[in-house]
Amino acid sequence: TLLLFTLCCTLVTAGEKETIYQAYLTNDMDTWKTTIEAMHAEVDKSHERELELLNYEYGYVGWCIGNNRKSEAKRYLERSLERIDRLKAANYRIPQMQAYESAYLGFQIGLARLKAPRLGPKSLDAAKQSVANDDQNALGYIQLGNIDYFMPPLFGGSKERAIEHYRHAERLMAPTGKGDWNYLALLVQLATAYEETKNIAMADSIYRKSLSVAPGFSWVRDELYPAFTKKHQP
């Protein structure tokens, strides 16, 4: 029965990962939200389950901020911060927690730009610690990339350096990237950074890569890539 129980649990987790992935492919954020609400309501979640939920909340908060749903973003952000605190207190996968801490400090800056001078350095420190403690931690490199990408050059940001961090993360994630929304999100961010630094050929190649990994990725297939090719056609 224990084996059966373990199998069921694994299937449940695989189910949510697939549900979130399909929601990302089709921009179905209602399903994404329903999934995280159902997971949040579960009692006695394992640390692993909390971490999985944290990743989906991370995606949802980022989407809320990007779509100017600030009050909703704040609600989920506060919930995630409590989750990070619990997992840190349990000493669970600390490098991952440091990467999420960095990301959530970035989200707080996204919600209130005036906090940047105070929270920006903390976000950078957390990301640096995250990769110092685990050099295979792709999420840590993504945060280093995001910090360089979003920080104005005047304050030390650099899109070229962001690309190096994103590429590092991409190399780490590529072997297990299929079926993972985080990998597709990284490819979009990398393509965007290449386009903004005028490296059109590389941007094109990364967009194509995302569609070879996920031909049904509607955001890239129907919006981003057609707009990109139209803008840069010879």
Predicted feature residues:
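Single-residue signature of alpha-solenoid repeat helices
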Residues: 32-35, 73, 80, 123, ...
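Boundary/linker segments of alpha-helical solenoid repeat arrays
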Residues: 47-48, 138-139, 170-180, 213-225
